[in-house]
Amino acid sequence: MKQAKFIVIEGLEGAGKSTAIQTVLDTLRQAGINEIAQTREPGGTPLAEKMRALVKEEHPGEHLHDMTELLLLYAARVQLVENVIKPALHEGKWVVGDRHDLSSQAYQGGGRQIDATLMKNLRDTALGEFKPAFTLYMDIDPKVGLERARGRGELDRIEKMDISFFERTRQRYLELAKSDASIVTINAEQSIEQVANDIRSALNLWLEQLQD
């Protein structure tokens, strides 16, 4: 197998990312890849976890501005990339991430409707040429996903947004996935078994292409 790669699982709330991540880990190990680090965003370092809390939690009496939210997310992302992901890849460890930059492009760019040029410039400034080698986008109808999320318990600040926010977010996800060959869309509304099969098929095909 060639050098270590960064793989990301993306999707709306309730899309089954945790289960998808486990399928990815199992598939990688079956392919003989055992040196694997896991990350989540926002978070993944002590400082980034503090920023995660600021983004996720309610702030009674003070509105968290959309731009503040966006900058916190990118600040946390830079901490994670520079202190965890890049060092792991350098050591030969594959990295499997629960969310990455695509989340901001979809949630803040799509859901919050922040200017696309600003989003691109911020991404380029913060991350430069760094990007995942392969991304699985778990696609689900927002109404279905939110029902699943509510079943897990109390919703966080972002999960409490109205349905139109998540519809815009999903639309941006789909647009981005369509324009980038490194992003594979998985229908997350299927049975657990079929979703797992689709993930394994997509991941194994990509791994085979790395051998060429």
Swiss-Prot record:
ATP binds at G11, L12, E13, G14, A15, G16, K17, S18. GO terms for molecular function: ATP binding; dTMP kinase activity. Coiled coil: none annotated. It catalyses: dTMP + ATP = dTDP + ADP. GO terms for biological process: dTDP biosynthetic process; dTTP biosynthetic process; dUDP biosynthetic process. InterPro entries: P-loop_NTPase, Thymidylate_kin-like_dom, Thymidylate_kin_CS, Thymidylate_kinase. Keywords: ATP-binding, Kinase, Nucleotide biosynthesis, Nucleotide-binding, Transferase. Phosphorylation of dTMP to form dTDP in both de novo and salvage pathways of dTTP synthesis. HAMAP family: Thymidylate_kinase. Belongs to the thymidylate kinase family. This is Thymidylate kinase. It comes from Vibrio vulnificus (strain YJ016).
